[in-house]
A protein has these predicted regions:
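Surface-exposed loop/interface segments of Gram-negative outer-membrane beta-barrel transport/assembly proteins
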Residues: 48, 161-220, 260-267, 271-359, ...
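Short, small/polar-rich motifs associated with maturation and membrane association
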Residues: 1-273, 277-280, 284-290, 361, ...
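Proline-rich low-complexity regions
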Residues: 109-110, 311, 370, 394
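Short secondary-structure junctions and interdomain/linker hinges
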Residues: 81, 370-373, 431, 447
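Long hydrophobic segments that form regular secondary structure
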Residues: 240, 367-372
Length: 482
């Protein structure tokens, strides 16, 4: 048998009881707990010495939520930090607000990853060791106005001394709409419109169709069932760590494939990360490389359009030119009075929009420890982001009143990159019960962005002179027509 003795603030002791009649137990202070160190700005500080507002989240807390987004993993973990997703689409953007909305920039906090400014979206949440959130003005005192909305400091997992260790995990999540709206079926729709015309517009020819209770197609379409589905997300993650007394490394790769709850919505994400740390004599070397590729398709219809279309409209109609039901039909030669709605299934089929993004972040740093109390660090960081948006719309009809007469193509490209050079000299020394920390440094940041866009529509304008006046008309045309 073994007795375990523990107390808050002390290291637990395990004592075998076999053959012992008298026990003398001395508990030692748990210095790791009492002197917990948090990352603050360009250095570290004991939590007990902190005077500003700071909150910490460890990796085990982040991993309790099944997500590929490090910011979404923060949701509900810290008081005063609001994490909102822009919509229910797979790959929807996420905003983080610390202590409400501010007036600087886009209200997003500044992200510092392993001591370097970067984009948290390039980090797989399974690669994170801890996150520190600086909420008050102390953050701006270190980073300046760019930290006016707060600072999130991310520390990723380091390599460990020893033989190569490989870990792998995978999980799958299933998403569905919590509750669908109770919409009118075909019979209810006919009755409500009959009442509407009975009260206000008996004179309209389309009124007779509803009055007689005629359903011109026999359709009873539940557009929610047609356009909503069960979403499935699959995630895979592999990590390799190892190293020696001098150098340590960590290499990881993550893949996520999500099919959204809306028809036509999907999101694929690949993350790769390499982190190196080395120590020799008075020199500490660190380097990191993060790479992310995303591909997404977003629905080409709105929820409003989906909920507005009549249940009398069939999804497919072989009598229509493009094979989809339209809100433009007649009964016995009398046009029915339908709202002008789009067939969202036709929009989903004939429109295609793909987004592709490439993120890369690289950093390298060298720290020289001249004395136990004096260190100097120089570093370089590169952040690059390439974004491509491609849209194609065929010639088709989803709304008889607004047909797409000509094919249309659009492409947008953006390439953003920034570079940061930093030099920091830090003095940190204890004098008895007192300690002094001083820092001096400089930071140079350069940023560039290139944008381009092009659009082509399958038509051309022809001009003619009629009765001495200039007239114009649009006709179908190819890319190589004069």
């Amino acid at each position: 048998a073994t007795m375990v003795i523990s107390y808050v603030g002390y290291v637990p002791q395990e004592i075998p009881l076999k053959g012992q009649k008298t026990l003398t137990v001395t508990l030692k202070d748990d210095t790791e707990m009492l002197d917990e160190v948090v990352v603050v700005g360009y250095g570290t500080m004991k939590k007990s010495d902190m005077t500003g507002a700071i909150s910490s989240v460890k990796s085990e807390d982040l991993m309790k939520r099944a997500t590929t987004s490090a910011t979404e993993a923060l949701q509900g973990k810290i008081a005063g930090v609001s994490v909102l997703k822009s919509g229910g689409n797979a790959g929807a953007s996420i905003s983080v607000k610390i202590r409400g909305i501010k007036t600087m920039g886009d209200n997003e906090p500044l992200y510092i990853i392993d001591g370097y400014p970067g984009d948290i979206n390039t980090i797989n949440p399974q690669d994170i060791e801890s996150m520190e959130i600086l909420k008050d003005g102390a953050a701006a005192a270190i980073y300046g106005s760019v930290a006016a909305n707060g600072v999130v400091i991310v520390s990723t997992k380091n390599g460990k001394e020893g033989e190569l260790k490989i870990s792998f995990n995978t999980y799958m999540t299933v998403n569905s709409v919590a509750k669908k709206f109770d919409m009118l079926n075909a019979d209810g729709y006919l009755k409500v419109h009959n009442m509407m015309y009975e009260n206000a517009e008996k004179g309209k020819p389309g009124y007779l169709t509803y009055k007689n209770g005629q359903n011109p197609t026999g359709a009873d379409t539940d557009w929610q069932d047609e356009m909503l589905r069960t979403g499935i997300a699959q995630n895979y993650y592999v990590n390799l760590i190892g190293g020696s007394e001098v150098a340590k490394y960590s290499l990881s790769y993550g893949h996520a494939d999500e099919k959204g709850i809306f028809r036509g919505n999907s999101y694929i994400q690949d993350n790769a990360r390499l982190k190196l740390n080395a120590h020799k004599y008075i020199f500490d070397f660190d380097a990191g490389l993060n790479f992310k590729v995303t591909q997404s398709k977003q629905p080409q219809y709105t929820l409003k359009e989906m909920y507005s279309i009549s249940p009398l409209i069939p999804v497919y109609d072989e009598n229509q030119t493009y094979g989809y039901g339209l809100t433009d039909m007649s009964v016995d030669g009398v046009k029915m009075e339908f709202p002008t709605n789009r067939n969202v299934m036709a929009d989903d089929h004939y429109k295609d929009r793909k987004y592709t993004g490439y993120d890369i972040t690289g950093n390298i740093g060298l720290t020289v420890k001249f004395a136990p109390w004096l260190t100097f660090k120089t570093s370089y960081t590169y952040n690059g982001y390439y974004y491509n948006d491609r849209y194609h719309r065929a010639k088709y009809e989803a709304n008889a009143q607004e047909p797409s007469l000509y094919p249309y193509n659009y492409e947008y490209n953006s390439y953003y990159r920034n570079q940061t050079f930093e030099n920091v000299l830090t003095f940190m020394k204890d004098f008895g019960k007192h300690s002094i920390t001083a820092m001096v440094g400089n930071s140079i940041i350069s940023a560039h962005q290139d944008k381009s866009s092009v659009s082509v529509e399958g038509k051309k304008t022809e001009y003619d002179v009629v009765n001495g006046g200039l007239t114009s008309s649009e006709v179908p045309g190819g890319f190589f027509d004069p």
